[in-house]
């Protein structure tokens, strides 16, 4: 995702489902007015979910997801169907495309049941009505219920109506809290600590840093970005001028050094902890970090990241966090790792789950993962809270959230 685009995690996710050759890809192309999806008469052309970002008026920035057929067959087919079902966990609006010449079958009805179970708003789109006789179209139209629409992707019939119906399903902003706008006032100074090490991307800031800067700008406050190596001299300079920063936000990995350089009277937290509140449930993840004290040898711990990136020596998820946990607990647990869209439905065998801040996941998917853990009685925490705990500054790192500090 480029720096000048809306992050994928902040876009409305619109997913198209249906059997093979129901015309999902054709409907996508008709709705978007672009050749976003490959169209073929060969059954099963879409073999993995395909993601495309675009602007779709009047919805604005959206993520269009084309999924494999829900009736795919064989061993590989079953894996593709599983991939389609996984997409549900991040779907804000579901579009079920049905071949009007065959109608809804067991697969479609089962999928509608899943929509209801997950609380996903959806439309049923009967495609290929151009292949029906006049009488057939009339009969189908008589049976159409609210939330269903007849279209022909081939000739564009009723596509505008479909777009208008999709727009009515636009989800409300469900974020309980902003990223940090409620923590600061206009003209407050916020210092962001961004270490530049070998893991930092070349020529840009990572997404959590970009989004935090944007949130500060929207509040009318001031942001100053410094490296951890210049933080102390920067603070000394401002304090000597009688200017006290309202908040310092750091990369969690730098907590140990930064906490020593930031005076106790200045509030300190991390990007990861801010995102824990913004994307998920801070209190749930705070409760989860307490599990560290009961870790034993051979306990299984899942470390999950929402993105896929090239792992280097010293990678935070696969190297640093396991080392911190081993050093803090004095135990030798077994670590397992997932990244990107992969997250197990069954986490019951894990002692705990440690998740990244989830900046690349939309809110629905992050909350799904938290719910998976909660429903199965498995504690979940996030990188920032865990690092704060092992460095001995957990209570201080929650300075912006006094109600959370009381729980420590």
Sequence positions of predicted segments:
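Conserved hydrophobic helix-helix packing surfaces used for dimerization/oligomerization
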Residues: 14, 190, 299-301
